[in-house]
Regions:
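Active-site loop/oxyanion-hole signature of alpha/beta-hydrolase fold enzymes
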Residues: 165-169, 178-220, 377
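Short beta-strand/loop motif that positions the catalytic acidic residue
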Residues: 325, 331-333
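Conserved alpha/beta-hydrolase catalytic His-Asp/Glu region
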Residues: 252-254, 266-323
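Flexible "cap/lid" loop of the alpha/beta hydrolase fold
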Residues: 229-234, 238-271
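Catalytic histidine-centered segment of alpha/beta-hydrolase-like enzymes
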Residues: 363-372, 376
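Conserved HGGG/HGGXW glycine-rich cap/lid loop of the alpha/beta-hydrolase fold
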Residues: 138-193
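Acidic catalytic loop of the alpha/beta-hydrolase fold
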Residues: 336-340
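Acidic, glycine/proline-rich low-complexity segments that act as flexible tails and inter-domain linkers
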Residues: 1-54, 83, 106-126, 271-275
Length: 387
């Protein structure tokens, strides 16, 4: 293949549009420049596979933003980055990163360009972030929606509130949706240790108090589901409904071993067993944003926080304690969840009389990161809204 043809293919693969269309003005004004760009750049280093297309667009976006004065080209690379699966919040983080090395004026300009491109692409606004002081630590709460019933989302062990981001936009239509970081995670990393499920349930109440919410629809996934159940046991009057995703009402023998492994073997050793427990093989092979996000969070996790969280989860003790729970309850299990299996989750449902049990086809443990559309459909049908 000739170098210029390789350049055309590389450009269209990165940007999604033919080079002739994107560089029409350049080709008319300076055919030599047009050929130089295609041959020297897109037919050369940008056509090689040492860096993925996603990595190249992240790098190109950062470089053009740092150079400054090239807004049209920056916008083109932002669109290319979106095409390569870079998430909107990653592009915003990239602009923030530019501030460290290229200064605030260029970073602020990059934020403007990113925002304009996202708006033009119809990408919803990012959730509003609030810093909230709880009894003995600070946390971060993300909010989408400003009217309607309140919904609070509690994430899985090992991640943070962004686990819910793929479903928050959908759920926020006619609802106020709050996703927060619980102790030892995200904005609440390093909170006082050790802690218990009761502490975590009190923190959930503290988040609701901070926003003046007396009663909420409570949704939890995995350990977040354990927190949700504990909160429902202690404060049933504050729970308008309960949605339990990929969770358990009793501890597993493996929990202590996972805590010890984090302390002894370090976090790099947790990546393979954790991600293969959370995702399907095709998702791991595709390596989309959800897998990358989860992998990086596990890798960066403080081993002390990791161990404290598993030991808290080891103390989950709600089995049979919701037998008299009156609020509507949804139990949502992934067909391909080999951690909190359909057998485990059907037991949870059986011990909450009147609950609705639903199996999501082809879905693993980390439901919102691999099959967000199925989760959003199920929760949107279950949760009331003002529309």
């Amino acid at each position: 293949m000739k170098r210029d043809e390789r350049g055309r293919r590389a450009y269209e693969g990165l940007m999604g549009v033919p080079a002739e269309e994107a560089f029409d003005d350049v080709r008319r004004i300076s055919p030599q420049m047009y050929e130089t760009v295609l041959d020297g750049a897109f037919g050369g280093p940008l056509a090689r596979a040492e860096l993925t297309r996603r990595e190249r667009e992240i790098a190109s976006t950062a470089i053009v933003a740092a150079i400054g004065g090239a807004d049209r080209r920056l916008a083109s690379h932002v669109r290319g980055a979106l095409r390569q699966g870079v998430a909107p919040h990653e592009l915003l983080a990239l602009a923030e990163h530019v501030a460290v090395y290229a200064g605030f004026p260029r970073a602020l300009n990059a934020l403007d360009v990113v925002h304009e491109v996202l708006q033009g692409a119809g990408v919803p606004e990012q959730p509003a972030l609030h810093r909230v002081q709880l009894s003995d630590h600070e946390t971060v709460v993300a909010q989408k929606g400003d009217h309607g019933p309140a919904v609070i989302l509690s994430h899985s062990l090992g991640v943070d509130w962004r686990m819910w981001e793929p479903v928050m936009e959908r759920l926020s239509h006619g609802r106020r949706v709050f996703a927060y970081d619980f102790r030892g995670h995200g904005g609440a990393a390093g909170a006082p240790r050790p802690f218990s499920m009761d502490d975590l349930a009190r923190d959930m109440g503290g988040v609701l108090d901070a926003f003046g919410v007396e009663q909420a629809h409570v949704v939890g996934l995995s350990m977040g589901g354990g927190i949700a159940q504990t909160f429902a046991v202690h404060s049933p009057e504050r729970v308008a409904s309960l949605a339990l995703l990929a969770t358990t009402d009793h501890a597993f023998d493996a929990f202590e071993g996972r805590a010890r492994s984090g302390e002894v073997d370090g976090m790099e050793a947790q990546i393979v067993p954790t991600l293969t427990r959370w995702f399907t093989a095709p998702a791991l092979a595709t390596n989309g944003w959800g897998v990358q996000y989860a992998r990086e969070l596990v890798r960066r996790f403080d081993p002390a926080d990791w161990a404290a969280a598993w030991r808290a989860f080891k103390g989950v003790d709600v089995q049979g304690k919701l037998a008299a729970f009156q609020a509507p309850t949804l139990v949502l299990v992934g067909e391909e969840d080999y951690s909190t299996t359909p057998e485990v989750m059907s037991g949870v449902a059986e011990r909450i009389p009147g609950s609705t049990y639903q199996v999501l086809p082809g879905t693993p443990h980390m439901q919102t990161l691999e099959k967000p559309e199925l989760v959003a459909d199920a929760l949107d049908r279950f949760l009331p809204a003002d529309r």
